[in-house]
């Protein structure tokens, strides 16, 4: 009986670790957006708000530069429960020499990019042990860093804005040993996420190649097998009012928040039930061989296209070499749009 109780407790802690993830950002954002004005206007604690605003002004560019990473936050026990919920695994196929900087491309986006977050923004899968002397910076939407408290929380995890200024700084201010992680499919790719489907947007994504050429950073493919299995996604039939409503909600979400609001469902609080928790499906992120890139301050179109094709070939090779090992058939194809 004690063994069953222990197992139930562990399962409960894993579930709670997932449940807290998005609400924490909402809570921190609400505290900063509503709490500070309230203290300023309606309480005798207004000096705290003034000091906080002065600090924000002073600290405004930190997230664009080196951030404020905390090894303590990245090693929270919370993330071990988060990682073991699926579970998530990090697999290295080649060493990353600390003599270079890197752009690691994470595919696919999935619904919430669990694999990228756990492997690169926490130490629950041992990134620092697997890739010693490499400092990872997971890139996400720049707008999130406009929200006080949220930006500090993200910086403590080593997360940075996916902006040209921020990424260029991290790839040039330190000669070697930095790795920025980009999810090139972005919000649009989340709409492609479905169990059993391996489809990504890449053929028109040239920004990361230009960045690599301008900074001389090596390109590194990575693929999270199982990422698309974490949620079921519904796309309603064309011509129905449900599809009309779905399209408009997605347009509004993309315009205002920079994200696509997907119609998803997963499991409930108990296994086998229906709800909005992700399915407990293993996610294995395989990091491939670095692709050397020359430093060219002003690369022409042909050079950019050449290295994009080289990268696509490297990604296909990585996918095909490991797909059968991580749950896909040997004939399963990666579709690149």
Swiss-Prot record:
Protein name: Diacylglycerol O-acyltransferase 2-like protein 6
Any one GO molecular function term: O-acyltransferase activity
Function noted in UniProt: Diglyceride acyltransferase that uses fatty acyl-CoA as substrate. Particularly active with oleate as a substrate. Has no wax synthase activity to produce wax esters.
Source domain of life: Eukaryota
Main location: endoplasmic reticulum
Keywords: Acyltransferase, Endoplasmic reticulum, Lipid biosynthesis, Lipid metabolism, Membrane, Transferase, Transmembrane, Transmembrane helix
SUPFAM superfamilies for the chain: Glycerol-3-phosphate (1)-acyltransferase
EC top class named in words: transferase
Coiled-coil ranges from the UniProt annotation: none
Family to which the UniProt record says this protein belongs: Belongs to the diacylglycerol acyltransferase family.
Bilayer topology annotation: Multi-pass membrane protein
Transmembrane segments: 22-42, 102-122
Gene: Dgat2l6
EC number: 2.3.1.-
Organism annotation: Mus musculus (Mouse)
InterPro entries associated with the record: DAGAT
Gene Ontology process terms (BP): monoacylglycerol biosynthetic process
Signal sequence interval, chain numbering: none
Keyword Transmembrane: yes
Reactions performed catalytically: 1,2-di-(9Z-octadecenoyl)-sn-glycerol + (9Z)-octadecenoyl-CoA = 1,2,3-tri-(9Z-octadecenoyl)-glycerol + CoA
């Amino acid at each position: 009986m004690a063994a069953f109780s222990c197992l139930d407790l562990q399962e409960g802690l894993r579930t709670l670790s997932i449940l807290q993830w998005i609400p924490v950002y909402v809570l921190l954002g609400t505290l900063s957006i509503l709490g500070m004005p309230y203290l300023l206007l309606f309480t005798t604690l207004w000096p705290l708000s003034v000091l906080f605003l002065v600090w924000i002004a002073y600290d405004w560019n930190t997230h664009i530069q080196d951030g404020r990473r905390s090894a303590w936050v990245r090693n929270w026990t919370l993330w071990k429960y988060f990682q073991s919920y699926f579970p998530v695994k990090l697999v290295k196929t080649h060493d990353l020499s600390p003599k270079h900087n890197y752009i690691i491309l994470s595919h696919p986006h999935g619904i919430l990019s669990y694999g990228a977050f756990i492997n690169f923004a926490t130490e629950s899968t041992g990134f620092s042990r697997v890739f010693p002397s490499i400092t990872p910076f997971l890139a996400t939407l720049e707008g999130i860093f406009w929200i006080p408290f949220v930006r500090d929380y993200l910086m403590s995890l080593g997360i940075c804005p996916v902006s040209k200024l921020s990424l260029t700084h991290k790839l040039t201010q330190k000669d070697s040993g930095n790795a920025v992680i980009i999810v090139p499919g972005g919000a649009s790719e989340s709409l492609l996420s479905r169990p059993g489907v391996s489809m990504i947007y890449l053929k028109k994504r040239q920004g990361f190649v230009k960045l690599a050429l301008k900074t001389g950073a090596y390109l590194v493919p990575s693929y999270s097998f199982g990422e698309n299995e974490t949620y079921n996604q519904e796309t309603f039939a064309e011509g129905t009012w449900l599809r009309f409503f779905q399209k408009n909600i997605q347009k509004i979400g993309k315009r205002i928040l920079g994200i696509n609001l997907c119609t998803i469902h997963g499991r409930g609080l108990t296994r086998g039930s229906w709800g909005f928790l992700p399915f407990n499906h293993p996610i294995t992120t395989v990091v491939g061989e670095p692709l050397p890139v020359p430093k060219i301050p002003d690369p022409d179109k042909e050079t950019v296209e050449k290295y994009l094709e080289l990268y696509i070939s490297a990604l296909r090779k990585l996918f095909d070499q490991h797909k059968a090992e991580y749950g896909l058939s040997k004939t399963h194809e990666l579709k690149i749009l």
